[in-house]
């Protein structure tokens, strides 16, 4: 399943906003039996480690057997936030 992160806004900065985005995705987009997630960062101008940490950690916690990959990560803000998350 592809999730267009840019649909949650182009400036994604706070932990509470990341949590709200995950809860919205879980309620309205994600099916319970998903096996793979592709997070598409097109349209995102600013991304902070706090926002993406909250979104991805909740995604991995709830769907722990699903694979998670990323696309359209050329934006420096997105690159650095994902790099920070992988530490």
What are these model-derived regions, one by one?
Residues 1-2, 87:
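Absolute protein N-terminus
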Residues 12-35, 41-86:
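Amphipathic alpha-helical interaction surfaces in cytosolic regulatory modules
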